[in-house]
Amino acid sequence: SLRRQRQMCIRDRYGNLVFVLPPGYQDHPDLDLYAYIYRYDYLDRLVYKKLPGCAPSYLVYDAAHRLVFSQDGCQRNDSLWSFFVYDIYGRVVVEGECSNSDKHVRTAGETVVLGTLMEGDTGLAYSGYQSSFDLVDPCVYVVNYYDTYDFRTRNGFSAYNFPEGTVSAIGNLTGSILCTHGSSGFIYSADYYDSNKRIVKSLSSRVNGGMDTYATEYSFQGSPLSVLHTHTDSSGYSLTERYTYTYDHSSRLTRVSHQYDNNPSVLLVEHTYDELGRLQTDKLDNGIYATDYAYNIRNWLTGIEGGKFSQSLHYTDGLGVPCYNGNISSMTWKSGAGATPRGYKFSYDRLGRLTDAEYGEGPSLSVNTNRFNEQVTGYDKMGNILGLKRYGQTSATGYDVIDDLSLSYAGNRLKKVADRSGTSAFNNGFEFKDGIDLPAEYEYDENGNLTKDLNKNITAIQYNCLNLPSRVMFANGNSISYLYDAAGRKLRTVHVLEGDSVTT
């Protein structure tokens, strides 16, 4: 019942949140699977955090109350800690991982951990920064420089001829070094500012050699008017592209144009707005494709109208049961001016969760009904789907259930999916592939990341220290590898298929 869908928040005597017990805990009082747990030190600083189904994370602060060490469950298995080193102004200058003992890490609270910038290519990863706290086997992921451009002559930067700044950058980030997780390389970058502390030029090395340069011009209000991107490869060959932005009197974006090298400029998109500031029209590709948007009095989107596709969304009107809470009661769409309308009527439970999507065609959705219905047969108290039925095309002229799924969980983590449907989608259409029948078909690591999906024949998923997937391995020997920088930006994808690799 609604009355029993309770979530409990428990605080200590100082008002700090120490437990969050969601509705699932009321029926299954397992703190490890369901509870959010927080602990604090005598200064009310968070020192322990545990999320449901995950190993706890530890946080350590120095005498200046700054986070200097943290450790999650996966790092604990490898006896690693993340470290953060600050300058005298409290800005992070070095981040990475180290192998300090737990006992040694705890002593950081007795001192102020500072990073001092030294002359020459010394210190952590030859960055010039020296930590006042001893770090065991440090692996540096991020280095930040501030205020000046003296770093240009340091190790790594000198190979790219970064220019000197002409405007004072006091108080701003001027340069950085980011490691590339999955390789031994580094990315070197520098930012240059105008007198209003806005970045007007940004230079960055590339993992495969060469440089990327972004030059930005601003309006008086601070909105970018143009961005010139110059890509130079390792041989010195350059390509340029320029994005130009136009705004109306309310600083709303109205036009975006793109120019590649010396080719004619192309209008990518043009926006118009109504009297209430809502997006009214989009025109793409020099105005060839236009899309109009309609809203109701509550500013809810009610219609999309274009030359190739149109859609209507209904909340309190239309063919479904009226919904006054923002849920869509029904929707219809057409792919082309003369196409037959198709659509769904939606039903929800008393908590606003979708239970049924009934398909139909024609103005009243009364033709070819139920062909592509979807039905959620149940939810648990955490809002997880327990059962799902999907209908679809099963033969050239027939339609039936293609998925009859039963989902099992361990806490909030999906454990098993069983498909009781005896039919398959026609012509290799989309459906769930029940690849295996085991008590546990999905596995997770200490941080809650998925490590196996046996229904998709994924035997292992490896993650980097940012909890981003670095490699996905399949039972047939195929794999996908990802390369990221230390900021989490994906730089490269390598697909290995039957021994052949494709890099993008």
Please state what every model-predicted region is:
Residues 102-141, 147, 154:
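Alpha-helical repeat/alpha-solenoid scaffolds of the HEAT/ARM/MIF4G superfamily
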Residues 67-122, 482, 489-493, 500-503:
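Hydrophobic or amphipathic alpha-helical targeting/insertion segments
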Residues 3-10:
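Short, small-residue-biased leader/transition segments that mark boundaries at the very start
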Residues 24-36, 49, 53, 75-80, ...:
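Acidic/glycine-rich beta-solenoid
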Residues 16-19, 36:
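C-type cytochrome heme c attachment motif
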